[in-house]
Each structure stands twice: as structure tokens, then as C-alpha cells.
């Protein structure tokens, strides 16, 4: 049997910052599933650096992406980091705190749409599957308002876990206080240690939704 894993998202899903020959969290998590479940994992990645949540949602309209989603046992999603960076830059210019609440609501709405779209693609009576959505870590601990916004956003994101199949992987807690250790030289993306920590965060959520677990 092959476990099919589809990863959607932004630069975190591509593994940006991990180093030339070092994998991001996707390959690491795939390897963990292989070891735990004693089955081969086939991975499909649909992600690009710079994508915002609206663009990640748009990936789900492509026929080949839909096929991979339909077949997937495990789905992971990263997103909203680029929306966050854009809003921080806009705030530094305008000092308008409502930017964060607008971006937060927009991101959350897009995550809800992604989960609904996955359910629509899966159709009625699908095979067991799991969705893991990463919350946001804070690459800007020196900007107070960014920290408040991320905490609020992550709290709101937890409501997604009320949907069947969905659990939230906690990147925020594992990066808090370890930014220097877990972030790459650009100060935004994880390094190899950071991606290992992300893989462990999603791994510890288990696979009880899957028939192979």
C-alpha cells in the first residue's frame, strides 16, 4: 500500500531557507509517516514562494491538483505568512492597526474555503483522510502589534479544527523564544532545525483519521 500525501502552500511548503541539500518539513514528515505506518509515502507538492492565501486557494481549481487531493490520505497546508509580511510592511508605513484585522479575517476565510473545497473534491463517502493546517509563528518578535495579531489569528484558526479531518499544527509555540535557533539567515523562513521542528509538530498530531493508522 502507498500513503498519498499532498502538501499545499507557500515558501514553508517548498522548504525555502532549509539549505541546498536539506529537506523542508514535507519530506521530513513523509519520512516519519513511512517509519510509523510501515508503508511507502508518495508526496505531491503544490506550493510556491510568495503565494498568499487567495493564491493557495486558487491552486485547488487546477485539475491535476484536484486529482491529487482526491487521492490524498494526508493533506498539509501552510499559508498567511506572506499576507502577514505584507500587512507588517503596510502597518510600518500607515500605522493603521485595522490592517491586521482585515488581513486576519481574509486569511481565515480563505482557509475555510480551502477546507470546504477539499471536502467538495473528495465528494460523498470519501476514503479516510486528514488535513493538517499550520498556524503562524512570529518572525517579528520586536514588533509588538505583529505579536498580538498573530496570537489573535492563531486563536481564531483553532476554530477550523471543529471540521472533520482537520487539526492545527502548532508552529507558533515551537518557534517562540527560539527564533534565532530556528530561523534562517533571512530572519523569516525556517532553517533546517526549524523545518525539523515543524515536521515534529505535525507528526505529533497522529493519523487516527486514516485507515492505515
Swiss-Prot record:
Substrate binds at residues 50, 82. It is found in: Spore coat. Induction: Transcribed under the control of SigK and positively regulated by GerE. Disulfide bonds: none annotated. Gene3D superfamilies: SGNH hydrolase. Keywords: Hydrolase, Sporulation. GO terms for molecular function: lysophospholipase activity. Its EC number is 3.-.-.-. The active site is at 11 (nucleophile), 186, 189. It comes from the Bacteria. InterPro entries: Ester_Hydrolysis_Enzymes, GDSL, SGNH_hydro_sf. One of its GO terms (biological process) is lipid catabolic process. Lipase involved in spore germination. Belongs to the 'GDSL' lipolytic enzyme family. This is Spore germination lipase LipC. It comes from Bacillus subtilis (strain 168).
Amino acid at each position: 500500500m502507498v500513503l498519498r500525501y499532498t502538501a499545499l502552500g507557500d515558501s514553508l511548503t517548498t522548504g525555502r531557507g532549509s539549505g541546498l541539500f536539506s529537506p523542508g518539513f514535507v519530506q521530513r514528515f513523509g519520512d516519519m509517516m513511512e517509519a510509523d505506518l510501515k508503508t511507502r509515502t508518495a508526496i505531491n507538492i503544490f506550493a510556491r514562494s510568495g503565494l498568499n492565501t487567495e493564491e493557495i486557494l486558487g491552486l485547488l481549481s487546477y485539475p491535476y491538483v484536484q486529482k491529487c487531493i482526491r487521492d490524498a490520505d494526508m493533506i498539509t497546508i501552510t499559508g498567511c505568512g506572506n499576507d502577514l509580511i505584507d500587512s507588517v510592511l503596510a502597518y510600518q508605513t500607515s500605522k493603521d492597526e485595522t490592517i491586521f484585522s482585515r488581513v486576519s479575517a481574509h486569511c481565515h476565510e480563505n482557509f475555510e474555503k480551502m477546507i470546504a473545497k477539499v471536502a467538495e473534491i473528495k465528494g460523498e463517502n470519501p476514503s479516510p483522510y486528514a488535513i493538517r493546517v499550520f498556524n503562524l509563528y512570529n518572525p517579528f518578535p520586536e514588533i509588538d502589534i505583529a505579536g498580538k495579531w498573530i496570537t489573535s489569528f492563531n486563536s481564531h484558526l483553532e476554530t477550523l479544527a471543529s471540521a472533520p479531518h482537520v487539526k492545527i499544527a502548532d508552529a507558533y509555540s515551537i518557534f517562540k523564544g527560539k527564533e534565532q535557533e530556528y530561523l534562517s539567515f533571512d530572519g523569516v523562513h525556517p532553517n533546517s532545525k526549524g523545518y525539523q521542528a515543524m515536521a515534529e509538530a505535525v507528526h505529533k498530531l497522529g493519523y487516527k483519521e486514516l485507515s492505515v493508522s
